[in-house]
Every structure is written in C-alpha cells, then in structure tokens.
Amino acid sequence: MAKLTKAEFVSALKEMNIKEVMELIDGLKEEFGIDPTAVVAAAAAPAAEAAEEKTTFNVTLKSDGGNKLAVIKAVKDLLGLGLMDAKKLVESAPVLLKENVKKEEAEELKAKLTEAKAEITLD
C-alpha cells in the first residue's frame, strides 16, 4: 500500500460522499478500537472542573499605591483596627488582610481599598 501524504488524504476525503465518510469513520473506530463514549466523557471532564468557581478568597495588600494615609484609613475602617495597628499593617505590605472571605466581601474590600489607591490581590 502506498503511503499518502496529509494533503493527498485531505484531497481524497473531500471527494468522498457522506456515506463513504461514515464508512471510513466506522472502519477507523473498528481498526483502532475507539470507543466514542469514552472520547465524549474525556472531553466533558475538563468542562466540569472549569465550572467549579472559587467561593472563598484571601485578600492581600500588595502596596499602598503611594497613598499611604488613605489606605491606612481604609484598612482601619474596614477591618475595625486601631490607627496604629492599621498603620503597622499597611507598612508591612505585602500582607494578608483577611483570610477565607466570601467572594462578595472580598470584592467589596478590594473595591474600597482600590478606591484609596491600594494594590490588592484576591487569591
């Protein structure tokens, strides 16, 4: 049997009618032992993993963004800290501000701190 190049195979495939293509597919499944249900199940697995969305986040202050005073005030108000504790926390950036908080709370904290020009990450 002569070896076909990819271009020759594609050209031959273009010339086939639907019935011939279906026979080719069935022959390939039989020849190589391909189980179509296994292929579908394997393809669906990554989609299921991607659907799982993270529900808790750690809020980390990366830097004060050059607006230290506003960030200290925001941290003080949002975390219920004293002024000195908030100042020490901001000055020790990067630092974890809150751990395992719900998505809504994490996004709210990020929005308010970003408004004060802080650099925040959620992970």
Swiss-Prot record:
Keyword tRNA processing applies: no
Disulfide bond positions: none
UniProt superkingdom: Bacteria
GO CC annotations on file: cytosolic large ribosomal subunit
Biological processes, Gene Ontology terms: translation
Molecular functions (GO terms): mRNA binding; structural constituent of ribosome
Annotated keywords: Ribonucleoprotein, Ribosomal protein
Annotated InterPro entries: Ribosomal_bL12, Ribosomal_bL12_C, Ribosomal_bL12_C/ClpS-like, Ribosomal_bL12_oligo, Ribosomal_bL12_oligo_N_sf
Residues annotated as signal peptide: none
Function: Forms part of the ribosomal stalk which helps the ribosome interact with GTP-bound translation factors. Is thus essential for accurate translation.
Subunit field text: Homodimer. Part of the ribosomal stalk of the 50S ribosomal subunit. Forms a multimeric L10(L12)X complex, where L10 forms an elongated spine to which 2 to 4 L12 dimers bind in a sequential fashion. Binds GTP-bound translation factors.
Family according to the record: Belongs to the bacterial ribosomal protein bL12 family.
Protein's recorded name: Large ribosomal subunit protein bL12
Gene name of this polypeptide: rplL
